[in-house]
Amino acid sequence: MEKVLSSHVGMKINEWYYHIQRFNVPDAEAYKEEIKSLLDDMEENQDLLLYFSLMEFRHKIMLDYLNPLENGKERANIRELAMKIKKDQEKLTGLLDFYFNFFYGMYEFENYEYLNAITFYKRAEKKLSLVSDDIERAEFNYKMAEIYYHMKQNHMSMHHIAQAIECYREKETYTVREIQCSFVIGSITT
């Protein structure tokens, strides 16, 4: 049987992430399953396997965000996956290092560990220049604004939310995120 090109799987992971960013659960689930089936037949590529693990982690964060479990419980394997990825962190470079720190910051934020979250976000910020996607940069700024808001650092929050909303306004498909940015601004100014 012929091996699946890792570049093909990488493109599929990018498409999966596109749907994760838009909170499009049905399509994200479909891509995840398709990619899992391709991984078994893929040529060996450790970086791509790490990328898959990071996106799987982000996928689970999305699901927890959309459907939080009661009393602070989390999905059984999200913590295990987080620990597995954290163990492999020293292998991450460049954009993968950005994603690790950004996603782990989200994870810590969702667990109300704000100081840990800001530490991971700051590490991600050092790699932000490697991110070419405007929406990804906007999402980073939105998350920074969100955490600074929770830490009562309104000037920093306003700085980041202004950058995020500017990008979201330019994209027709991000109206919901633009509205969420407006909520943050409204919360800061009242």
Enumerate the language-model features and the residues they cover.
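Flexible inter-repeat linkers and adjacent short helices
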Residues: 1-104
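Alpha-solenoid helical repeat architecture
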Residues: 3-5, 44-49, 92-99, 132-139, ...
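Amphipathic alpha-helical segments of tetratricopeptide repeats
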Residues: 33-40, 76-90, 118, 122-133, ...
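Loop-centered beta-sheet repeat module
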Residues: 147-190
